[in-house]
A protein has these predicted regions:
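Eukaryotic tandem repeat interaction scaffolds
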Residues: 159-220
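Conserved hydrophobic beta-strand positions in leucine-rich repeat
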Residues: 71-73, 95-97, 117-119, 139-141, ...
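A generic tandem-repeat structural signature
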Residues: 98-99, 103-147, 155, 160-165
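Canonical leucine-rich repeat
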Residues: 83-86, 105-108, 127-130, 149-152, ...
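Leucine-rich repeat
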Residues: 67, 88-92, 108-114, 130-136, ...
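N-terminal capping/linker segments that flank leucine-rich repeat
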Residues: 3-9, 13-94, 107, 112, ...
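Short hydrophobic transmembrane-like helices used for membrane targeting/insertion
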Residues: 2, 10-14, 18, 102, ...
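Canonical position 11/12 of the leucine-rich repeat
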Residues: 78-81, 101-103, 123-125, 145-147, ...
Length: 286
């Protein structure tokens, strides 16, 4: 027995001498470094760097690992023209790149976690890359070159939508967005608003500086608090009066503010209809 034990100890000693580091303590290879992030536009890279805390004040290269954890980026008025590279920010929830020179939104296509997107004052025409960003709740696209908004039809979580100062004529793509509470379409080329009464959750609706004459599609919007219709082609306020009369429970009429300056209202609208609306609690600003 002692001979066997001694033999075993000798074998163990030889193994230790040959391989002094136990297998369970063997060194592992370090993880491969994260690929360097690449931006086509140095102005965009500078904006992103400000939100990478460890590298905001240095010149170490940004890596893809740095980008994947970013939730917010803001780069207002920096002369940004190209968004390439931003597609690596897969967990981005809020992005504000207003007042730049952006045209192409394709790098945003896969950023499906964005909830707040501000791109006002750019040169954007094509909204199709936004069609699958279903998490969007706030979208600001005022003062661009947008003509068609069909791509927004699928953004069913949108609560606030700003599209003023564009070239929009057809609003049919947004009249069935179930969560929409604020809609701004000032300074466009809108002549008709069919289906707008489908947006039953609207609190604020702004159509200033368009070419709207018929207000009958507004009937059926019980939650409106602010209705802006300045500088259109409205002559008759009958539909508004009917809306207020039907509000027997006084749920919205006493809280409704209507802005009508700059419309060719008839004498009847200015006197009888104004008076009737005011008696029902509607505040007229003309």
């Amino acid at each position: 027995m002692m001979k066997k034990l001694a033999g075993s100890l000798v074998r163990i000693l030889i193994a230790v001498l040959v391989c002094p580091t136990p297998l369970w303590c063997a060194e592992t290879s370090p993880p491969a470094p994260s690929p360097t992030a690449s931006f086509a536009d140095p102005n965009l890279e500078a904006a992103v760097r400000k939100f990478v805390i460890e590298k905001r004040d240095g010149d170490k290269p940004l890596t893809e690992a740095d980008l994947v954890n970013l939730s917010t980026i803001q780069g207002v008025g920096l002369g940004i023209t190209n968004l390439a590279g931003l597609e690596k920010c897969q967990n981005l929830a809020a992005l504000d790149l207003s007042k730049n020179k952006i045209i192409d939104l394709r790098p945003l296509k896969t950023l499906t976690k964005i909830q707040s997107l501000s791109l006002a004052d750019n040169q954007i025409e094509d909204l199709s890359p936004l069609a699958e960003i279903n998490a969007l709740q706030y979208l600001e696209l005022s003062r661009n070159r947008v003509k068609h908004i069909q791509a927004l039809r699928s953004l069913t979580n949108l609560a606030s939508l700003y599209l003023s100062h564009n070239q929009i004529t057809d609003i049919s793509a947004v009249v069935k967005l179930p969560c929409l509470a604020s809609l701004y379409l000032d300074h466009n080329q809108i002549r008709a608003i069919p289906g707008i009464n489908g947006l039953t959750g609207l609190f604020t609706l702004s159509f200033n500086d368009n070419a709207i004459a018929d207000l009958s599609p507004l009937e059926g919007l019980p939650g409106l608090y602010t209705l802006m219709l300045e500088n259109n082609k409205i002559r008759d306020l009958g539909p508004l009066l009917e809306m207020a009369k039907k509000d027997k429970e006084q749920r919205f009429a006493p809280f409704l503010n209507v802005y009508l300056a700059g419309n060719p209202l008839t004498s009847t609208a200015k006197h009888r209809q104004f008076s009737a609306l005011k008696e029902l609690g509607v505040r007229i600003n003309n």
